[in-house]
């Protein structure tokens, strides 16, 4: 299990931001056109005429997490409830792009924390997952960034994050192994230090919730 680094220059919360100037839509479209030529296609044929525009717009959306910040996302939705038992949001669907091949990986994220009196709006946990997923990623870093973010905004007694995902770079190319899943975890505070707390979390994410009537 992985413990993220939580302070100083090692912080991952705001890491991996593009430092180059914004590339224009036209430049992105030209790059897609070059890619089409590179794979032996004709960008002028009817079915591909709008492909450069569509691909550029799709990648802007799929990487829109670069333009978001944790402060703006949370927007003050932190409440002093005096609660000190585990809060778990499980089965958060996540889609991201592998930074090595820019192919999708997708799966579920489970996020838990034990408050230190303060709680955050539940939807914010899902939005944190979404923000970091919409960047070029590796699953290990994505898992750590989610844990770091919850730790940063709440300073809770502990944070636990588990992600289960399937990677298209292992399915569509390379070893070509459909059905393979990668599981990563980040445990902070009591989840790392106390075995019973960690086991409670792992038991809860394995348990199937009751069906919604």
Curated annotation (Swiss-Prot):
Reaction equations catalysed: GTP + H2O = 7,8-dihydroneopterin 3'-triphosphate + formate + H(+)
Keyword Cell cycle: no
Pfam families named among the record's database cross-references: GTP_cyclohydroI (PF01227)
Alphabetized UniProt keyword annotations: GTP-binding, Hydrolase, Metal-binding, Nucleotide-binding, One-carbon metabolism, Zinc
GO cellular component entries: cytoplasm
PROSITE patterns in the record: GTP_CYCLOHYDROL_1_1, GTP_CYCLOHYDROL_1_2
Record-linked InterPro entries: GTP-CH-I_C/QueF, GTP-CH-I_N, GTP_CycHdrlase_I, GTP_CycHdrlase_I_CS, GTP_CycHdrlase_I_dom
EC number(s) stated in the UniProt entry for this protein: 3.5.4.16
BP-aspect Gene Ontology terms: one-carbon metabolic process; tetrahydrobiopterin biosynthetic process; tetrahydrofolate biosynthetic process
Keyword GTP-binding appears in the UniProt entry: yes
Name recorded for this polypeptide: GTP cyclohydrolase 1
Protein source organism: Synechococcus elongatus (strain ATCC 33912 / PCC 7942 / FACHB-805)
Lineage: Bacteria, Bacillati, Cyanobacteriota, Cyanophyceae, Synechococcales
Gene assigned in the entry: folE
